[in-house]
């Protein structure tokens, strides 16, 4: 379910409202200036053909767009035929997330397009996101309009280089739920950036397309969760059930609505449903009281979320509240024994010359890496256009787009209510929508660049989550070292990585998502799991093998967490090129014989994954299995194809039986790796709308039935990685972070180690002796007898 987060909220716009430009500092193109560069067209078709143009001319042409006056007065012509409009230079990169202004205009445009007042009044806005343009548009922007300003990114044409005068308008995609009709629709709005003499800078929207999507339910919104909790707590039979359990103060009661999933026809998307879980806090005067320590069980509630009515209620079984746990809380001063550690000294991260990264809008450069940062309500952090600056070979692409597109959490207890706890946290709630405002010194350390995120709320207003994405450098221990044993001379380098991250809360759990970029060309994807266990209550003397007893009457069910990373790769591929393939590598043991007389031989065997059905693969640690994405037309100095390999970390597969109900919607969990040929609209492994989805195997499992060829293609990797959580007492009351992830590592991509040119550490052999630890600096133990007992 959704959670409260720090936001700045703007009111819902009316259809006629005007908003500020997304980039108010950008220059205005004069009407006269357009003639100097070309007649401005409506899209990519209006380009100026230049059959032969050298690099100097290209720079001159592209700089002409950026060097126009910023203080040019507006026209004072006030014709009665309409407001005078002046074309603006492109101010937002085609991959930049929608600004607050763009979201407001998109919402207002859709609301104004409603056919009747009833339709307009019933509109609720689930999601407003950028329609990501074709890769050729991205190449165009990166060549002439925005960093890295590299015209070599443009595909070669017979007519020579082409310099455009403008980029096509940005577009927004809206998922709209109509609360009155229970219909879900998708809208596409074109956002034209204009400037009007009377109203100042703003956007103008135009509906390009709209359609109603039948037989689906979109994600549940945070406002719906809050309303659902209030409806349940005010329901008289529910209040009676609480009194039967000795709960008179309803302010102590927590109602966490969960999506119902799809277990039978009763869960069909013809109704918008939620089945809440109920908990009870012990104290009301503690703002961080751990209410999850006392689950209230034996009560069945089904809520019609569309009409906010309880349609089914049953007090099935009186399960006593678990006893009050003195170890339930985790805030400072309320931990075990009520004493916090006193021997933790300050640790400061100091960069006296500032960071090594450079930021231009959403464009990031660091240690030969460059990429763009995006963000969506569903996925959260998105990394675009990943490339590496490789000396004379220039900017070499690695991936078009990297993101986490889904996560599924199935529980292993067959008893009610735990058997129906199968959360799709991205598709049913939204990872980005539940992201936090991060705090300096707590979530990130060092010299930090934050990025805000803008969303629509349920009624169409704009909400801003400040400091939503954190970007910073981290020391990461040793990068490489060698000491010559003959001379005693040594060379050592310390590793540094650039980390981009965000953190979200979904009900009781926290998930922190990271993309790490390393100096040796490696990219690491990491998820950190923490938060509070989802617990169950037990009858006196009861024991369940499907979980871990926390204390008598309270237990934590076993469960699994699965994450799906979607990676549209581009190893040495310019936008528009489709020259990648995937090979699987298994290390084989040589059979004894004349080729293996010493019985010690083993070797790596490669298998080309030729089609999508062949590319449904699982991890195999016994053969050190990994997969390499290679460019079919680029070689290294040995003549081998350049590539990047996916190296699995610890992983698992679903432990539920093959007929488990949640696998109807999560068939993609049946394999660790899927490979598909890129196709627009194939974005989420369980389909666009997994909430209450009755269709078996929608999404990835259906797409691969086309069995498209992969031998030379635009490749998308879908890597599913999971963890099986058998709870420990040490996971209570709040879980220490659990790490899970994988690595993308260069494999024949470079001609040698890209990390050999990292300079020696600045502090090597120059550390002050004052930093050496002596016996006198060792802190005395502060353990008390009470702490020792606990």
Curated annotation (Swiss-Prot):
Binding of Cu cation, residues: 559, 561, 725
- Which residues are reported to carry the modification 2',4',5'-topaquinone? 509
Family per record: Belongs to the copper/topaquinone oxidase family.
What's this protein's name?
N-methylputrescine oxidase 1, peroxisomal
Q: Which reaction does it catalyse?
A: a primary methyl amine + O2 + H2O = an aldehyde + H2O2 + NH4(+); N-methylputrescine + O2 + H2O = 4-methylaminobutanal + H2O2 + NH4(+)
- Which top EC class applies here? oxidoreductase
Briefly explain the null phenotype.
Altered nicotine biosynthesis.
Pathway it works in? Alkaloid biosynthesis; nicotine biosynthesis
Q: Which cofactor does it need?
A: Cu cation; Zn(2+); L-topaquinone
Q: Which residues bind Mn(2+)?
A: 714-715
Active site residues per record:
425, 509
Q: Quick one: which residues bind substrate?
A: 423-434, 506-511
Location in the cell reads: Peroxisome
* Disulfide-bond pairs as recorded: 444-470
What functional role does this protein have?
Involved in the biosynthesis of pyridine alkaloid natural products, leading mainly to the production of anabasine, anatabine, nicotine and nornicotine, effective deterrents against herbivores with antiparasitic and pesticide properties (neurotoxins); nornicotine serves as the precursor in the synthesis of the carcinogen compound N'-nitrosonornicotine (NNN). Amine oxidase which mediates the deamination of N-methylputrescine to produce 4-methylaminobutanal. Oxidizes preferentially N-methylated amines.
Locations of Low complexity compositional bias?
A: 9-23
The UniProt subunit note reads as follows: Homodimer.
Query: What EC designation does it have?
Result: 1.4.3.-, 1.4.3.21
